[in-house]
Amino acid sequence: MSASGPEAPGDIPALPPPPQPGSGPAPPAPAAAAQEAMDGRAELPAFPRAGAPPLAASDTVPAAPEGAGAARPAAPLRPTSFSVLDILDPNKFNSRRRRCVLLGPVAPAACAPCASAPCAPAPAASGRPPRAEELERRALAGAGGVGAAGAEPPNAGDPFKAGEAETNDTNGYSSGGGGHSPSADSGDEVPDDEDDDEDEAPETEAARGAEEARGGGGGLGARGSGCQGAAETDASPGATVDEAAAPGPRENSPVAQGPPGGAAAPGGAGTTPQGTATAAKPKRKRTGSDSKSGKPRRARTAFTYEQLVALENKFKATRYLSVCERLNLALSLSLTETQVKIWFQNRRTKWKKQNPGADTSAPTGGGGGPGPGAGPGTGLPGGLSPLSPSPPMGAPLGMHGPAGYPAHGPGGLVCAAQLPFLSSPAVLSPFVLGSQTYGAPAFYAPHL
């Protein structure tokens, strides 16, 4: 036992805690070594206060001055070991805190022994009044519902605790019992405005009330240790109550509050979709109105002057185009059939507004618009008359009878078969032209 004592200073993290309290009889421990041990513990209040999990490094440092300090013959080895621990402690605590965070909901049970076993007897063994004062301050802060600012002043005098609190704040963890979830403290998307400041008070009160109900000493130890499992489980009911009770301020905030609230805690995900929906509804309405007013339903066709002149001339000839007329006109003007059709629809609407009492079935006939009783062939485009020996090629496609009905024949027969008959002036008679208006094929014309 005594042989292992001198080797302890070199291997303090690997030394198991149980053999040390009973390692040898109580020898005349040097006063300097005991004093340095007490001073070292006074300089490291973060060990019991932070409530670290009972790992080797944290157990050997408080237990070493009680039993193993007597077996060490050389006093200079003591401050060396403590200086090394002083340098390494904050990193160890941060890594343990992250392990507790990874545990999730099971973290409170895992952190309970670390809060009860090392933290409770340590103040009695060392007899340090700052620990009792800090416990009283935290209890008062928890009873009064003070936020994280009220619970952090005890850390001002401790350089290690203050550094630890700074690292926790930068990482987004709640230090000193703030009761906030990491995403709520980090503030990734939510702006730090008045609405969030107003919402923090009920959240902290609810979290502290839940923690006091679970148990005063253990809850404070778990909170001081920074194990985020307890903070998250306590903060989730507060977050749900906060979002459900005060939806108004969160809706008015410029940034949507849904995503950070949803990432805060699994318990608060029940109400976050509603908050997201209420916050996004005005945006959807605005985007909907913008899309209705500014969305181009169809690309507006910019007709050239030649296209407009040709379309106007065609409309003067006839207000209704057949399939063949529309196809030929679209091909001649380098337009699509849909563009020609829409232009004629709009032009007919304009014409009806300009001539409210006019008969829509009558052809325009060069702008004059002969009535139903007009002579056959007067409305033919290109000045086509029944006796014209050489009608233009576009005339048969735009041919209409006195009643103004389009010459819709079976398939493309009318368009293709009218050409040979209309090319011979002997066949062109008013009777033949009139018979074509009812869609009869051209090869029936001589028999009629």
UniProtKB/Swiss-Prot annotation:
Ranges of Gly residues composition bias in the record: 215-227, 259-270, 364-382
PROSITE patterns from the UniProt entry: HOMEOBOX_1 (PS00027), HOMEOBOX_2 (PS50071)
Highest rank taxon of the organism: Eukaryota
DNA-binding stretch(es), residue numbering of this chain: 296-355
Subcellular location: Nucleus
Keyword Repeat: no
Annotated region described as Disordered, given as residue ranges: 1-80, 115-299, 350-397
Basic and acidic residues bias: start-end ranges: 130-139, 205-214
Residue ranges, compositional bias (Acidic residues): 186-203
Biased composition (Low complexity): 1-13, 62-79, 115-129, 271-280
BP term (GO), one: cell differentiation
Tissues where this protein is expressed: Expressed in hemopoietic progenitor cells.
GO cellular component, one term: chromatin
Compositionally skewed regions (Pro residues) per UniProt: 14-30
SUPFAM superfamilies xref list: Homeodomain-like (SSF46689)
GO molecular function: DNA-binding transcription factor activity, RNA polymerase II-specific; RNA polymerase II cis-regulatory region sequence-specific DNA binding
SMART domains: HOX
Keyword field contains Nucleus: yes
Keywords, in A-Z order: DNA-binding, Homeobox, Nucleus
Record family assignment: Belongs to the NK-1 homeobox family.
Functional description taken from the UniProt entry: May be required for the coordinated crosstalk of factors involved in the maintenance of energy homeostasis, possibly by regulating the transcription of specific factors involved in energy balance.
Name used for this protein in its record: NK1 transcription factor-related protein 1
This protein's encoding gene: NKX1-1
